[in-house]
């Protein structure tokens, strides 16, 4: 936000509490290993016309070079088995279904809901840019779909899709990326 406002000629003051600037984007080293604080990977950067890609290109003045993630971009490890998350989306769906063939329809339902959340999220944030009469007229319409997801926990929502606790565990295995465990996190952040 600060970068975009600055590019528009606005005066901006950014206050950083941490000793190293960068917020969610900085790294640190411990015992010879380098760790990133928050951004591990960002999907969709290979699509140059995507909103996210255009936003990052604008903020960085096209100075970021994006690397494609490995085919296996994440691995969820349980004591008895590991589950790979594979790109692209179609391969991810195939892989999850291969682990849980009896859950095929529930997995399709999950993917459909996640896709809906993504669409609803853009409408929700667009509504925040409206003011006055426009906010009054369009605000409720633009936010209603998002709020039906955001006001429930990830665990509650997934439990309505499936009763398979292992599948829920795998699908929520990345909960550290959004900071709260599934029984506390908003499903909209999942």
What are these regions, as identified by a protein language model?
Residues 1-119:
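N-terminal glycine-rich phosphate/pyrophosphate-binding loop and immediately adjacent elements
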Residues 79-186:
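Rossmann-like flavin
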């Amino acid at each position: 936000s600060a970068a975009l406002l600055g590019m528009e000629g606005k005066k901006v003051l950014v206050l950083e509490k941490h000793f190293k600037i960068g917020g969610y984007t900085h790294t640190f080293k411990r015992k010879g290993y380098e760790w990133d604080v928050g951004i591990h990977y960002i999907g969709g950067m290979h699509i140059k016309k995507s909103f996210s890609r255009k936003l990052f290109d604008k903020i960085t003045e096209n100075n970021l070079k994006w690397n494609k993630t490995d085919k296996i971009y994440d691995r969820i490890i349980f004591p008895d088995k590991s589950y790979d998350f594979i790109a692209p989306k179609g391969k991810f769906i195939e892989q999850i279904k291969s682990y849980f063939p009896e859950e095929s329809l529930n997995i399709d339902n999950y993917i459909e809901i996640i896709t809906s959340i993504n669409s609803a999220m853009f409408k929700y944030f667009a509504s925040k840019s409206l003011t006055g009469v426009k906010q009054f007229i369009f605000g409720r319409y633009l936010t209603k779909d998002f709020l039906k997801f955001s006001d429930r926990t990830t665990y509650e929502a997934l439990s309505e899709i499936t009763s398979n606790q292992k599948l829920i565990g795998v699908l929520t295995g990345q909960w550290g990326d959004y900071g709260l465990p599934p029984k506390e996190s908003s499903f909209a952040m999942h």
